[in-house]
């Protein structure tokens, strides 16, 4: 389910399943919102006879592909979010899958985590440089598993001759490598992923070293290998 469980429905986690955590915080200089899905143990492959909807690894990879496809998109200025929203769903649609929540929402500055009117719904305002929004495709199987990958992005001007826009991802947390089926990713998606990991290393690595968090630093290096 895309919603948090109640105290009455919570149960003990096991190493044989995925865990989705949607987290964030309010700070004087901004608000954060991020979702990662991880697997505690060994992940089985996604080869037949399992359909993608019963194969968590393939489903996760398709959600990640949607996140990447929308995050790296270049689009004309004044484009409405609802116009490009399908890029986040395309990889899932290719397998006959979908999700039942919005693809993203505006982020407040020490205000609402979900802030109107920025986002990817049909009634949101056109995207403009300087706006922050989330990109968070997902996939859910009630009683089995849930997947969501959420990053916060800044709308910026693209390096094009005409007035176009693109997104700059400001969430710097690696994805779970065990859940990624590289055979499904295009060369462009792999290049994007490697570039994103280089950015995480460059920005987060030195801070972990400064705080002498060596175990966290080693985890970061391992999690961001090309």
Language-model regions: role of each:
Residues 1-226:
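Active-site neighborhoods and metal-handling regions in enzymes and metal-associated proteins
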């Amino acid at each position: 389910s895309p919603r948090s469980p109640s105290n009455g429905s919570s149960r003990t986690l096991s190493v044989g399943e995925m865990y989705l955590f949607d987290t964030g915080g309010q700070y004087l200089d901004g608000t954060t919102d991020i979702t990662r899905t991880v697997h505690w143990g060994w992940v089985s492959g996604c080869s037949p006879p399992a359909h993608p909807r019963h194969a968590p690894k393939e489903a996760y990879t398709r959600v990640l592909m949607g996140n990447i496809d929308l995050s790296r998109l270049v689009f004309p200025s004044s484009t409405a979010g609802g116009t490009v929203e399908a890029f986040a769903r395309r990889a899932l649609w290719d397998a006959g899958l979908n999700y039942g929540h919005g693809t993203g929402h505006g982020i407040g500055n020490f205000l609402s985590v979900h802030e109107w009117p920025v986002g990817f719904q049909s009634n949101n305002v056109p995207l403009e440089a300087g706006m922050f929004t989330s990109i968070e495709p997902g996939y859910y199987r009630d009683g089995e598993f849930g997947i969501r990958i959420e990053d916060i992005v800044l709308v910026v001007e693209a390096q094009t001759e005409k007035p176009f826009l693109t997104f700059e991802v400001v969430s710097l947390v690696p994805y779970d490598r065990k859940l990624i089926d590289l055979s499904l990713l295009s060369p462009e998606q792999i290049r994007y992923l490697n570039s994103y990991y280089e950015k995480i290393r460059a920005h987060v690595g030195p801070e972990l070293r400064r705080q002498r968090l060596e175990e966290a630093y080693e985890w970061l290096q391992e999690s961001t290998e090309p």
